[in-house]
Amino acid sequence: MKHKIKKRKLSRCTEHRLSMLKNLSISLINHEQIITTLPKAKELRPYVEKFITIAKNKNTLHGRRLLLSRLHNNKLVVDKLLNVLASRYQGCKGGYSRVMKFSTRKGDCASMAVIELVNRDVTAKGKVCDKNKEKNEVATKS
């Protein structure tokens, strides 16, 4: 019986599933729109919305440390959450992301979906928050 089972297993062990969700959420926060399979997108949506809610309501040292511990210590993503996304969604009480069905994948006919942040910055799609990029810019200036 499947009583009180809310999460999908996605054919992975717990550690792999949590790591995959963390990586997908980092990509979604960076690019504000990603294409993935439909079950992964449906599982990712509440996961990311909790991060945005923490960034909105707990814009303190404790909130920053919570986000850092849950996002692989990626400081650039946490800074974007606290500075950009928290201020963007300050008036909203939820529903920060949307999942739209896409086509099927050619290789295995898996149903694909686009998950994106509502009121997203269209120019953020190609940009990557990367530490190496900042180091290269500093090196070329000097």
UniProtKB/Swiss-Prot annotation:
GO MF annotations, alphabetized: structural constituent of ribosome
Protein family according to the UniProt entry: Belongs to the bacterial ribosomal protein bL17 family.
NCBIfam families attached to this UniProt entry: L17
Gene3D superfamilies the UniProt entry points to: Ribosomal protein L17
Pfam family, one: Ribosomal_L17
InterPro entries recorded: Ribosomal_bL17, Ribosomal_bL17_sf
Record-linked HAMAP family: Ribosomal_bL17
Superkingdom as given in the UniProt entry: Bacteria
Species name: Wolbachia sp. subsp. Brugia malayi (strain TRS)
Keywords recorded for this protein, A-Z: Ribonucleoprotein, Ribosomal protein
Any one GO BP annotation for this protein: translation
Known partners and oligomeric status: Part of the 50S ribosomal subunit. Contacts protein L32.
Protein's name according to its UniProt entry: Large ribosomal subunit protein bL17
Encoding gene per record: rplQ
GO cellular component, one term: cytosolic large ribosomal subunit
